[in-house]
Swiss-Prot record:
It holds the Pfam family Thioredoxin. It comes from Kitasatospora aureofaciens (Streptomyces aureofaciens). The gene is trxA. Participates in various redox reactions through the reversible oxidation of its active center dithiol to a disulfide and catalyzes dithiol-disulfide exchange reactions. PROSITE patterns: THIOREDOXIN_1 (PS00194), THIOREDOXIN_2 (PS51352). Keywords: Disulfide bond, Electron transport, Redox-active center, Transport. PANTHER family: GEO12009P1. CDD domains: TRX_family. This is Thioredoxin. GO terms for cellular component: cytoplasm. The lineage of its organism: Bacteria, Bacillati, Actinomycetota, Actinomycetes, Kitasatosporales. Residues 1-106 form the Thioredoxin domain. Belongs to the thioredoxin family.
Length: 106
């Protein structure tokens, strides 16, 4: 139930070709709110194990992924299902809101 670090090189296999829905969290090392959300994402990854995969993208290291999916501010979460973006959520959010977002998009 751990979160997966995804890069430009692994995005296709880890996210687009995943047999499960993938929640992709776009973050950056300089982003305060991203650091606050990180432990919540780890909890979500454990609680939703088997139902959803949780992946993190460092936008500083993978700017092309951010621009490809129109991520302009971080943190942003995109829910991928079958290689397509099914839903998105911008900004820091408490665990209850993240869980509600997941439940609605699964």
């Amino acid at each position: 139930g751990a979160t997966v670090k995804v890069t430009n090189a692994t995005f296709k296999s880890d996210v687009l070709e995943s047999d499960k829905p993938v929640l992709v969290h776009f973050e950056g090392p300089w982003c305060g709110p991203c650091k606050m959300v990180a432990p919540v994402l780890d909890e979500i990854a454990n609680e939703y194990e088997g139902k959803v995969k949780v992946a993190k993208v460092n936008t500083d290291e993978n700017p092309q992924l951010a621009s490809q999916y129109g991520v302009r501010s971080i943190p942003t979460r995109l829910m991928f299902k079958g290689g397509e973006v099914a839903a998105n959520m911008v900004g820091a959010a408490p665990k209850t809101r993240l869980a509600a977002f997941l439940d609605a998009s699964l």
